[in-house]
Swiss-Prot record:
This is Protein CDV3 homolog. Keywords: Acetylation, Cytoplasm. The modification N-acetylalanine is found at A2. Residues 131-144, 185-194 have a biased composition (Polar residues). Signal peptide: none annotated. It comes from Xenopus tropicalis. InterPro entries: CDV3. Belongs to the CDV3 family.
């Protein structure tokens, strides 16, 4: 029973070496595994049981490795599903109205060719392939209402040799003739006496009751001088010195 299990292990390792081709020591490990799995002559049954357990473990490892190898393939498939190429749909533009644009471009090309044929004299003559009055740039000009021209009144021309500005001319026109000045009028000849007039109010009347209005400034000094003249000292002030 041990020999077929050892052969299955050998086949497993050989297939792994063929697939990966990375491990350089693959043949050496395969030979060691062969020597390890083959039981010697006259070996007990325990050795065969251990070999069978090893073969079962090898099968489990093979299944795990095969499952791991399947996972990257699934991941690659998912990535391929995510990166989908975008295909642009073809749109039919035959229903669009592009004929007018094409016709206008053809007209412009024809005009340009005519202009080149005629040469530089074509501009001097003033020729043009299209009618300027029918262009879109003249629509606003036609819509505008005619502006009425403002007629200014001519200014009166003075024959005199003195120049007068417009402000002086207007003032001269509105000025009225005046007679001689009135000497006795307060408006034309104001006096200082008019500003010096004192208007009595109620407060001034109350102040007159409490205070004495002094009209003469030198009256107090005259009274003091009279009193001093009456108080004369007739005694001899030096008599005290003679007694000593």
């Amino acid at each position: 029973m041990a020999e077929p299990e050892g052969r299955s292990l050998d086949d497993f390792f050989a297939k792994r070496d063929k697939k990966k081709k990375k491990d350089k020591g693959g043949p050496v490990s395969a030979a060691g595994s062969r020597g390890a799995t083959r039981p010697p002559d006259g070996a007990p049954s325990s050795f065969s049981s251990s070999a069978s357990s090893m073969s079962g473990a090898g099968k489990g490892i093979k299944k795990e490795k095969s499952g791991k190898s399947e996972n990257p393939d699934q991941l690659q498939e998912k990535e391929d599903d995510e990166w989908k190429e975008f295909e642009q749909k073809e749109v039919d533009y035959s229903g669009l109205r592009i004929q007018s644009l094409q016709i206008s471009n053809e007209k412009d090309d024809d005009e340009y060719e005519k202009k080149e044929e005629q040469g530089a004299d074509w501009e001097d003559i003033g020729g043009c392939g299209t009618d300027k009055s029918s262009g879109p740039w003249n629509k606003t000009a036609q819509a505008q209402a005619p502006i009425s021209a403002v007629i200014e009144a001519p200014e009166p021309v003075h024959t005199g040799g003195v120049y007068r500005p417009p402000a002086a001319r207007a003032s001269v026109a509105t000025r009225k003739p005046q007679g001689p000045p009135e000497i006795f009028s307060d408006t034309q000849f104001p006096s200082l006496q008019a500003t010096a007039k004192h208007i009595e109010s109620r407060r001034d009347k109350e102040m007159e009751k409490t205070f004495e209005v002094v009209k003469h400034k030198n009256r107090a000094r005259d009274e003091a001088a009279k009193n001093q003249a009456l108080r004369l000292q007739l005694d001899n002030q030096y008599a005290v010195l003679g007694e000593q």
